[in-house]
Amino acid sequence: MSFDPVHGLSIKELNAVFFSTFLITNMQTQKSNVFVNGKVLSLHQLTGQSAHDALAEMKRLSLDDHKKTRLPGPNPVSIEKKDLAKLRSGYVISPKTDGTRYILMFTRLYNYKVVIIVDRALNVYLLPLQIVPRNLYQGTIFDGELTVAKSGAPTFVLFDAVVIAGVTVSHLTMGDRVIAIRRSLRSFRTHEKDPAVLSMKDWAPIESANVKARLKVSEDMYHTDGYVMVNVNKPVTYGRDFDFFKVKPHDKHTVDFIVMDAVGTLGLFDPNVRQNVPITKYDTTKSMFLIGTIVECSFKNYTWVPLQMRSDKTEANDVLTYQRTLVNIEEHITLDDILNSIKA
């Protein structure tokens, strides 16, 4: 195969083609389809030692000393009425994007620059962005969500940052982390060959007079399923964060169960016994899932109904999450409840 810059490819694009080809042929990868909001992205998934090394690099960059490998970021809890008073001090709010949570990592692997995304099941994919600021490859981890904008464009929405260009920022306030993200991406440019567009999540001070207008701008751009609220004064927490809240519409509450047997038993993780325990059953005449599959279910007519398989997860929600979801369904907190609590 020969390339000629005169016939449509610049030297930079030639280098990008060569680099992408080199990575695919020198790393352990397999072609994989990633499903996002009904759209299919064709990416290369790292396998074997290559995936292991990428995850080890993520753990190293994030300074995470947890015994297990996990995504370096917080997991929100569903807000309850008893939590509303917390929102009066230092919180921002944004629509909850309906997509799949990923870590976006820029680093060097085997001495070559790579852009990688990692989901909660620790699946690792190459995301070949074309025009990236060079210093990001010194080691950068962004937290975000892969979604499809209402325009139809696959989009990676950036929430937060752990480390940028080799400098740890997870200990900073959220405002400083957002400033650092924006500065690091000033020379980033979207390219027509990028598999996804990068976008910044808009966090609005929850007490601001125009908060509803700002929320609507994001809701007009993306498919959303509720709201998330973050304390701006806290550093990044790895794992469950009891000061990071989410709220969903009454008909959007879901729980991720694990299929425990062939007769439809659905279970959750019970930390007291350190294993999955049966909770409910689903109707196997309407759908069937393999044992061990994580299935997202919604609560309809007093029963849990499967919505979709969660290929991005390998573990069920725990019993605490389930119990709090039942409280959420009963309390039925709305956006107006949240905003009115700030004025109280």
What is each residue range found by the language model?
Residues 3, 7-18, 23-32, 38-47, ...:
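Nucleic-acid 5′ end/cap handling module spanning
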Residues 108-149:
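Conserved loop->alpha-helix
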Residues 135, 163, 175-179, 245-250, ...:
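Short, low-complexity, polar/charged sequence segments that are solvent-exposed and flexible
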Residues 144-145, 157-159, 164-166, 170-192, ...:
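Eukaryotic endomembrane system proteins
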